[in-house]
C-alpha cells in the first residue's frame, strides 16, 4: 500500500465475462485517514461534545447569531479555501461558547475531511509516546501534514518549558508554511496571547495567526451561569 501512487485507480478487470468494479485507491486511503484521525481526535472529545451541532445551538445575542452563521459558512465553503490556510481564531472568557462552536465545526467536518482536534499538551504527550519510533519533528510533520483541518483547543492553558517552546514554534511555523487551515480557541486576551507566543525571540506568531484567521471575540457573560438552576431548585 505504501508504494501506491496517491491518485492511482485500479484498472477494470474482466473475469468470466463479469466487469469488476473500479476501486479508487486514493479515496479508499483518504477514508482510512479520516477514520484514523477521528480516533486520534477522540482523545479531546467527551460524550456530550458529540451532541454539539449548529441546529441545537442556543443563541443568546445578535453578535453570537452572526458568529454562528459565519462558522456554518466556514464549514459549507471549506473545500473552496482549504488549501489556502485560512482559519478561525476564537478568544473570550471561559463559558462563553468557544468550545461549543469548536465542537459544532468538528462534528460537521469530521466525516468528510481529515480533521485533527488536539491541544498543545495532548500533542506533546503524543510526542513523548512516539519518541524513538521517529524524531519529534518527523512525528509532528507526519501528524500535522496529513490533516486537512487542525483544531487546537484551549491554547495558552499550559505551562510550557524550553523544550515545549521549541516544539510550539515548529508546530505553528509548519502550519503556516504548509498552509494548513487552523481553528484556535483560547481564554487568553490578545496581550496575554502575544506574550505566550513570544517564544525563541519571535514576536510574529500572533500577527501571522491574525493574518490567516478570522477573529471572533466572545465578549459576553458566562452562559453556564444558572444553566442548571431549575434542576438544582428541585432538590
Model-derived features with residue positions:
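Walker A/P-loop nucleotide-binding motif
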Residues: 82-102
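A structural signal for short, well-ordered beta-strand segments and their strand-loop junctions
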Residues: 89, 115-118, 183-184, 217
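Loop/turn-to-beta-strand initiation segments
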Residues: 113-114, 146-149, 178-184
